[in-house]
From Swiss-Prot:
This is UPF0292 protein TV1259. Mg(2+) 1 binds at E17, D62. Its cofactor is Mg(2+). Binds two Mg(2+) per subunit. Residues 11-93 form the Toprim domain. One of its GO terms (molecular function) is metal ion binding. Mg(2+) 2 binds at D62, D64.
Length: 119
């Protein structure tokens, strides 16, 4: 799953909430464009900027109430502006990985790798 999204990120940007989320994805070898939302602009202005520049994006906000709210708002605005929004990774992590924030992904990934090594 992660390998697939690393490849996908080489041509499609990922939207995250903050700089720490960006750093976490970099630790997981996501080297494509990652766009940080928390820059002091509104969701609608941010969505306008995104829709003017991209035809497809991946959303990876946190998995708490705020992150879920942002995901839903971005999805609504961006799809309404003709942008394809990929939520598969967000939904997969929310359902299968016991974390609440994107920042926790590297540590969780490391734990999973260690489990596999011990088997």
């Amino acid at each position: 799953m992660m390998r697939r999204y690393r490849r996908k990120n080489s041509s499609i940007p990922i939207i995250v909430e903050g700089r720490n989320d960006l750093a976490s994805l970099r630790k997981l070898s996501f080297y494509g464009e990652i766009i940080v939302f928390n820059r002091g602009i509104s969701i609608t202005s941010f969505s306008d900027e995104i829709s003017n520049k991209y035809r497809e994006v991946i959303i990876l906000t946190d998995f708490d109430n705020k992150g879920s709210f942002l995901k839903d708002r971005f999805y609504g605005y961006l799809t309404g502006m003709g942008v394809y929004v990929d939520l598969y990774l967000w939904n997969f992590i929310r359902k299968h990985v016991p974390i609440r924030t994107v920042e926790e992904l590297p540590a969780e990934f490391e734990r999973e790798v260690e489990k596999e090594i011990q088997m």
